[in-house]
């Protein structure tokens, strides 16, 4: 064990990729999951679209650099958490490893993450890229939800560490509610919610646009994103919140100042109702999406009710938040309150239906917030990949050569670090 280089942990999300070395508390880099390529596409030449000849093949950029290249086509290879374009993903990983981590892939084990309900074929593609193109000595593909549970251990005593819980993972492109029992995801009960960070940004953009506050149109999206990240919070009661702003606006309304990218002049806007209306679409999705009207607390309740009866109480007791879109102030508190109401109402109803003969035992609902929420998945990966067990459960290059990519279909659960 001694003298071995730390494993590389890479968590690829729809919006951002988090990368760094195991054992660290935070990722070294957080970059947008996009890649800028030169497209040579003429009409009808699909095959030649991006495989340029010779040295042009290296002419691409990823992350923040990719966004700044106007003469290149910017692509996002991951949609709703799942890789859609494997050619681009391979190029993306190439720069992640060599340019950002500056690692020699043959010397480091790798921990990559996968979304819930990822297909076994996708794991095989990942294994092929890592073992064939980068020649890594070992690879482990971890489920994001399990890592998020592990990350929540920072907020509890060692005796209470458990890999049973409900993970609410809300990123840029998709929100999942994932029940996990003893480190295994209960796949049949996963629900996904079509509302995530990007939808909140769009919704705030729309609110600002309706008010016509003088934002340059080409900057309206980044302004909405900045407003969301700086000023938004979750309120306990919509009507009261509106009243607060109407009676004492100066105390609540914030000023956002931006610089017009073209004229370089400053512009400033007032940020009012947007502050609490943005994140409110988690609890009232119909504000932004008329096709989906189920609040997040009801989705969580339904997920847990679908699970086997003997794990329901532990699932209510350990609801873990993960991902950037759960970072709004009081998000956890509001979710806990709404969920508690739903659960208590059900218990009360069952008591009434039994004519008072049944006294149900109250259910403990706990939503756990911790300071690692935003990079919970990466941090969980960093913790697990720095334990000695990690190297025993990794799939090695030798196994891969003997058996083939199918070994990566199954990755054993490990590390209830008791």
Curated annotation (Swiss-Prot):
Residues with the N-acetylalanine modification: 2
Modified residues (N6-acetyllysine): 240, 244, 251, 254
Any Gene Ontology CC annotation: nucleus
A GO term for molecular function: actin binding
GO terms (BP aspect): Arp2/3 complex-mediated actin nucleation; cilium assembly; positive regulation of lamellipodium assembly; positive regulation of transcription by RNA polymerase II
Keywords on record: Acetylation, Actin-binding, ATP-binding, Cell projection, Cilium biogenesis/degradation, Cytoplasm, Cytoskeleton, Nucleotide-binding, Nucleus
Domain of life: Eukaryota
Protein's cellular compartments: Cytoplasm, Cytoskeleton; Cell projection; Nucleus
Matches recorded under InterPro entries: Actin, Actin/actin-like_CS, ATPase_NBD
Keyword hit for Cytoplasm: yes
Similarity-based family: Belongs to the actin family. ARP3 subfamily.
Its job: ATP-binding component of the Arp2/3 complex, a multiprotein complex that mediates actin polymerization upon stimulation by nucleation-promoting factor (NPF). The Arp2/3 complex mediates the formation of branched actin networks in the cytoplasm, providing the force for cell motility. Seems to contact the pointed end of the daughter actin filament. In podocytes, required for the formation of lamellipodia downstream of AVIL and PLCE1 regulation.
Quaternary structure note: Component of the Arp2/3 complex composed of ACTR2/ARP2, ACTR3/ARP3, ARPC1B/p41-ARC, ARPC2/p34-ARC, ARPC3/p21-ARC, ARPC4/p20-ARC and ARPC5/p16-ARC. Interacts with WHDC1. Interacts weakly with MEFV. Interacts with AVIL.
Name assigned to this protein: Actin-related protein 3
Species this protein is from: Bos taurus (Bovine)
Lineage: Eukaryota, Metazoa, Chordata, Craniata, Vertebrata
Gene: ACTR3
């Amino acid at each position: 064990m001694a003298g071995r280089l730390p494993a590389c942990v890479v968590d690829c999300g729809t919006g951002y990729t988090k990368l760094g070395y195991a054992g660290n508390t935070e990722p070294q880099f957080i970059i947008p999951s996009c890649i800028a390529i030169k497209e040579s596409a003429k009409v009808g030449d699909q095959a030649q679209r991006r495989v340029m000849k010779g040295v042009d093949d290296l002419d691409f950029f990823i992350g923040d650099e990719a966004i700044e290249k106007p003469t290149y086509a910017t692509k996002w290879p991951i949609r709703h958490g799942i890789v859609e374009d494997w050619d681009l993903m391979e190029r993306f990983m190439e720069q992640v490893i060599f340019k950002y981590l500056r690692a020699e892939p043959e010397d480091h084990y790798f921990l990559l993450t996968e979304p819930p309900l990822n297909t076994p074929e996708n794991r095989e593609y990942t294994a092929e890229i890592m073992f064939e193109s980068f020649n890594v000595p070992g690879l482990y593909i971890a489920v994001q939800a399990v890592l998020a549970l592990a990350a929540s251990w920072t907020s509890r005593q060692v005796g209470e560490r458990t890999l049973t819980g409900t993970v609410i993972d809300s990123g840029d492109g998709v929100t999942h509610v994932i029940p996990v029992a003893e480190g295994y995801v209960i796949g049949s009960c996963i629900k996904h919610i079509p509302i995530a960070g990007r939808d909140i940004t769009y919704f705030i953009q729309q609110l600002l646009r309706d008010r016509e506050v003088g934002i340059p149109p080409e900057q309206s999206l980044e302004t909405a994103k900045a407003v969301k990240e700086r000023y938004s919070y979750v309120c306990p009661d919509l009507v009261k919140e509106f009243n607060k702003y109407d009676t004492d606006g100066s105390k609540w309304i914030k000023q956002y100042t931006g610089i017009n990218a073209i004229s370089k002049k400053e512009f400033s806007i007032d940020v009012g109702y947007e502050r609490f209306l943005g994140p409110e679409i988690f609890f009232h999705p119909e504000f932004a999406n008329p096709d989906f009207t189920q609040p997040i607390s009801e989705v969580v309740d339904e997920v847990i009710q679908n699970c086997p009866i003997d794990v329901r109480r532990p699932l209510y007791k350990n609801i873990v938040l993960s991902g950037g879109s759960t970072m709004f102030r009081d998000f956890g508190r509001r979710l806990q309150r709404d969920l508690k109401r739903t659960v208590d109402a059900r218990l009360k109803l069952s008591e009434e239906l039994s004519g008072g003969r049944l006294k149900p035992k109250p259910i403990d609902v706990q939503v756990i917030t911790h300071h690692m929420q935003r990079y919970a998945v990466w941090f969980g990966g960093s913790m697990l990949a720095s334990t000695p067990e990690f190297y025993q459960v990794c799939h090695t290059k030798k196994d891969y050569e003997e058996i083939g990519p199918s070994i990566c279909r199954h990755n054993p659960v490990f590390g209830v670090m008791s």
